Amino acid sequence: MLTLHQSPKLRLHRRAGWGIALAAAVLAVPVLSTPALAAAPGDPATSSSFNLKPGPDLSSAVTALKTALPTEGVQDLLDQGNRIAKTDASCTTDPFGTGDNGAVLAPARKLCWDAGDAGTEEWIPQGITGVSDAQADELWGSRKPLVTAWYDKANPALCTADSGTCPDKGVRLSFLDPETPVTGTPDGRRYRHALLVEPYFNSYGNASYRAIDIHAGGIAWYKYYLYVADTLNGLRVFDMRSILDLNPDQNASVDDTTLNGLKSNVTDESKIGRQSNIYYSHTYRYVLPQVASYKFVAAQGNSSAATCVATGAPKASYISIDRSAPTAPTLIMGEYCNSDTDHPEKGRVGALPIDDTTGLLQETGGTVTTTSAYYLPRDLTQGAARYNGMYYFNRSYLDNSGSLRRATITNGRLVDYGSNITNAVGPEDLYIEHGQSMPGATQYLWSLTEHRADTTAGCTDTGSPCGRVLYAHRLSDILARP
């Protein structure tokens, strides 16, 4: 059986300097031939291509890890934030500029990462979600966290004999509450990283875990469960009640004694999992183990990191939650495609039902059945969200201004609504802060940018400068555009 952790990796490096990497990677999965003619953009797609089945049950390994390592909650991570993002006037990074393709839509809100995260070549930000996805009242306890995902680029050029960047650390999350200022620093917002891991039992029968080598181009949070896009396979699922703490005494220089009498170490950057009776985490205090997965039922139709085909399973490039109908939540999933002459497909977007009682995907007879699917009107889509029937799409153009597009279902087809909205350079996943918990509350469309600021010619253009930020547009501002 092909399980998620056995599958070949697929990462989509889309920066001009990196190229459209892996564009011809041959994958060890069944591949369907590319049709001679492209599907018509906006037409209904075969919805069953998005159907999913549950993967292996990892709960026993997670339970065993929780008997060895203490758990913490999301609010604890926020309280233990050891990095500070800046907002308002203190956030000076500007990936919007004046815009290459017309008047840029300036964000209503913007947060800048700390200097290390803003400039790192190792970690690339991709996915975003938040408590407005997770909870109808838009609160986690008393907090309003955002969560973002970064993948480890694992660039061999960064790897030296004494460098901790040699191992591929997989995917990390950042937990940040944009509404809670740092005491004494009104423009500061604390945040904390946590490493995603896959649990397993080692050859001695002991519970351990390993890094998860995926792109994590989209994440979505519903109730306790965090969904992470696994490009060629489907979805990985994590439980926010299972965040493990490897340094509860907050003294990194001394190994902690674990609940089962062993040790945990947060100083060795090269190691992960249980090794010689010590638990490691590539120096991260917190790790979040995978609890479940969903795998595409259809054979994977894609054999390229960049291009797409019209049939077979899609790529899970990005995901989001549609909470328009409070009792019928939906997970939106779509593809990134860089069309060319031989591969003209623009990509597909589908909708999968969520069981509002459990927070997991809704199954019938062991299958998650897609409720709708369409071919995308345009390619180069990095993120998609849907609310009250309106689709929102982030599109990227290397180190040029990105664009925000809208679309609706009209006469049975997914068609453009209004004109292009010039956006930030390198826009990624999308998340809607729906504001349903308070009548008249401002609704926001959140996203983040992936390209770090550097001195290359394309990144210093005043029309489209590079830089990493979290940002939000008011939905009302977007809908007011022609």
Can you name each region flagged by the protein language model?
Residues 69-121, 180-210, 251-312, 361-377, ...:
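Surface-exposed loop and turn segments in beta-propeller and other repeat-based domains
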Residues 144, 320-323, 327-438:
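Loop/turn-rich, solvent-exposed surfaces of beta-rich toroidal or solenoidal domains
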Residues 134, 151-152, 232, 241, ...:
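Residue-level signature of beta-propeller blades and closely related beta-rich strand-turn architectures
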Residues 2-4, 17-118, 463-482:
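Sequence/structural signature of beta-propeller modules
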Residues 176-186, 239-277, 325, 339-365, ...:
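Short loop/turn segments immediately following beta-strands, especially the blade-tip
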Residues 119-143, 211-222, 308-330, 377, ...:
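Structural signature of eukaryotic scaffold interfaces centered on beta-propeller domains
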Residues 113-138, 148-217:
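Blade-loop segments of beta-propeller domains
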Residues 155-177, 234-242, 330, 339-355, ...:
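Structural motif
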